[in-house]
Structures are given as structure tokens and as C-alpha cells.
Amino acid sequence: MIRLASVDDAAELELLNAEFNGKGKTTEESIRASLLTNRREIVIVADGSGGRLAGFVCVQLKKSLCYEDFMPEITEVYVRPEYRGRGIAREMLTFAQEYCKKIYPLHSFELLTGSDNTA
């Protein structure tokens, strides 16, 4: 199931982030606080099996004085290796796009990737 992340996902998101970005980049407490207070970020998760998450997507809502509307930027996409090849990243990105369209008058999405991205 693809859904918005909740504070109950903080521990799993910390583990996923450690797999994705390396250990020590954030803490469960910091993730929990961000999920509760950061109104400029949307986090989407994919449920895996056994209470684990299969992956996550982060969308930052950028605002510029030059434009009336928010510009969503997909800043993180991660799917655990054992769940890859099943279309989970595509499902999370579609969910993010549809969710943002319901809330904000969007004209486009921005996606940045690293030079070593092979997906």
C-alpha cells in the first residue's frame, strides 16, 4: 500500500535513510519531529511485509517570490533492494503527483538525480 508517512513510521524511515544515505545522517527523533512540523515536505511510503517499509519518497514544496504557486521537488526516492523491479517507485511518484495536485495548483514537478543514478 502506498500512503503518506506518519510519525509511527519514524523508526523505519531512519533505517531506510541509513540504507540510502549512510548511517548517522539523522535520528528517529529528528524524523518524527520533521513529520510533525515540516509543512514544506511531503513523505510518501510503500508498505512492505512484516511491518517494514519497502521504500519512501520525499517531496519538498519550494516557494519563490517570483511565482504564485508552489513548485514540488522530488528530493529523495528509495526502494529497498528486495522490493525493486515491482513498480513501487513509480507507484509512490504517481501517488505524490496526485496528492500534490489535490492540494496545490501545480503546473510541473521537479526531479533531481545524482550523476551515479542508474535507475
Name every feature range the model reports, one short phrase each.
Residues 64-70:
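A short, polar/charged loop-to-alpha-helix boundary motif
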Residues 15-27, 65:
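Helix-loop element at the rim of GNAT/NAT acetyltransferase active sites that forms part
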Residues 79, 85-98:
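Conserved acetyl-CoA-binding loop-helix of GNAT-fold acetyltransferases
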Residues 52-61, 73, 78:
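Conserved beta-strand in the GNAT
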Residues 90, 114-119:
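Conserved active-site alpha-helix within GNAT-family acetyltransferase domains
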Residues 24-43:
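Active-site rim helix/loop that mediates acceptor-substrate recognition in acyltransferases
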Residues 101-113:
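Conserved GNAT acetyl-CoA-binding A-motif
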Residues 1-13:
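A short beta-loop-alpha structural element at the N-terminal edge
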